[in-house]
UniProtKB/Swiss-Prot annotation:
Cited Pfam families: Arginosuc_syn_C (PF20979), Arginosuc_synth (PF00764)
The organism's taxonomic lineage, starting at the top: Bacteria, Bacillati, Actinomycetota, Actinomycetes, Mycobacteriales
Organism whose genome encodes this protein: Rhodococcus erythropolis (strain PR4 / NBRC 100887)
Assembly description: Homotetramer.
CC annotations in GO: cytoplasm
Keywords for the protein's UniProt record, in alphabetical order: Amino-acid biosynthesis, Arginine biosynthesis, ATP-binding, Cytoplasm, Ligase, Nucleotide-binding
Predominant cellular place of this UniProt entry's protein: cytoplasm
Family the entry assigns: Belongs to the argininosuccinate synthase family. Type 1 subfamily.
Reaction equations catalysed: L-citrulline + L-aspartate + ATP = 2-(N(omega)-L-arginino)succinate + AMP + diphosphate + H(+)
Protein name: Argininosuccinate synthase
Coiled coil: none
EC number: 6.3.4.5
InterPro entries: Arginosuc_syn_C, Arginosuc_syn_N, Arginosuc_synth, Arginosuc_synth_CS, Arginosuc_synth_type_1_subfam, AS_cat/multimer_dom_body, Rossmann-like_a/b/a_fold
Length: 399
């Protein structure tokens, strides 16, 4: 009986060619698994059938949109996760979910080998293979695009020589990855850091000047860190992301032009569109400013960068990431309330906050009548707070 390879299938050129290549080079049967993460574009049934037409013995589509929103996007919101303080992990958080479903498919379809279509220069090869190792260390992994140094030209030539039914073009300038959390664009003329993105780079967002005279104001409600309503209308996490993608995207919000440090040691330029993600993280951060005690908030902000780095580096299933999740979940117990935001000209402006768990005390904060802050206590506090610095200064100055 032939081995079975379970392939993470995108429907694009590389993974379509991989189906035929794996069969020819290894004699194995290929089971193609496509994961719907809300990426839009082609109908998933078309993608499923394409895999069969390319030679897969079975082709499966998994609707993972709600799972992605609830179990991957929501923890990212809770962690205010922005890699290098900018990137909301658009692609990075999707890979562990894909890994999970590929492993499940391997178990249910008799697969002993798993495969992906990643190159050897990017982060995704690491995310996939480290994930496979964490969930199913017994499975073998093959990566034809990386291991045989496929170029787009080689893949197109193989497709033409083997009559693989996929429309391809050498003129497509960009590499694009997208899901409901956002969209990532790279390569082409963007590899020159001085080149400004052109209009055709963007899809999830409009030019920030298009709706200049029609700004949008909205209220996002959270319950223990989870977005539960927009303008008073109950929403699921998926619905919140989808609605904010449309509304914030219409205002040009969520465009990011980033030079980032890849795990493999190189710097790369990426253009991201993440309107819903950026609005939700901004609103969530602001609610935490209102509801988290100072020392807890300070420590959480330090931890957030490490959480982001772990996820970016493909360590979603690591013991440290698991431990940090426990900490983050604890911090969310009182992150309940409403944040009002103004979206305009590509910018997000918070202009209102309210929470039953607020630590903001008006009587302590006000400078007007009703001030309950005992200013007489401040003199001694300042003296004690600066005492160690004062002692050191006297020593250094010889006083």
């Amino acid at each position: 009986m032939a081995d079975r390879v379970v392939l993470a299938y995108s429907g694009g050129l590389d993974t379509s060619v991989a189906i035929s290549w794996i069969g020819k080079e290894t004699g194995a049967e290929v089971v193609a698994v496509a994961i719907d993460l809300g990426q839009g574009g082609e109908d998933m049934e078309v993608v499923r059938q394409r895999a069969i037409d390319c030679g897969a013995v079975e082709s499966v589509v998994v609707d993972a949109r709600d799972e992605f929103a609830d179990e991957y996007c929501l923890p990212t919101i809770a962690a205010n996760a922005l890699y290098m303080d900018r990137y909301p992990l658009v692609s990075a958080i999707s890979r562990p979910l894909i890994v999970k479903h590929i492993v499940e498919a391997a178990r249910s379809h008799g697969g002993t080998i798993v495969s992906h279509g990643c190159t050897g220069k990017g982060n995704d090869q690491v995310r996939f293979e480290v994930g496979f190792g964490a969930l199913a260390p017994d499975l073998q992994v093959i990566a034809p695009v990386r291991d045989y140094a496929w170029t787009r030209e080689k893949a197109i030539a193989f497709a033409e020589e083997n009559n693989i039914p996929i429309n391809v073009s050498k003129k497509s300038p960009f590499s694009i990855d997208q899901n409901v959390w956002g969209r990532a664009v790279e390569t082409g003329f963007l590899e020159d850091l001085w080149n400004a993105p052109t209009k055709d780079v963007y899809d999830y967002t409009q030019d920030p000047t298009v709706n200049w005279n029609a700004p949008d104001e909205l209220i996002i409600s959270f319950d223990k860190g989870r977005p539960v309503a927009i303008d008073g209308r109950p929403v699921s996490v998926l619905e919140a992301i989808q609605e904010l993608n449309k509304r914030a995207g219409a205002q040009g919000v969520g465009r990011l032009d980033v030079v980032e440090d890849r795990l493999v040691g190189i710097k790369s330029r990426e253009i991201y569109e993440a309107p819903g993600a950026m609005v939700l993280i901004t609103a969530h951060q602001e609610l935490e400013h209102v509801t988290l005690e100072r020392e807890l908030g300070r420590y959480k902000r330090q931890m957030e960068q490490r959480w982001s780095e772990l996820v970016y580096d493909g360590l979603w299933f690591s013991p440290l990431k698991d431990a940090l999740d426990t900490f983050v979940n604890k911090t969310q117990e009182r992150v309940t309330g409403d944040i009002r935001l103004f979206l305009h000209g590509g910018a997000i402006t918070v202009n209102g906050r309210r929470s039953p768990e607020s630590l903001y005390d008006f009587n302590l904060a006000t400078y007007d009548e009703g001030d309950s802050f005992d200013q007489s206590a401040s003199k001694g506090f300042v003296e004690i707070h600066g005492l160690s610095s004062k002692v050191a200064a006297k020593r250094d100055l010889g006083l």
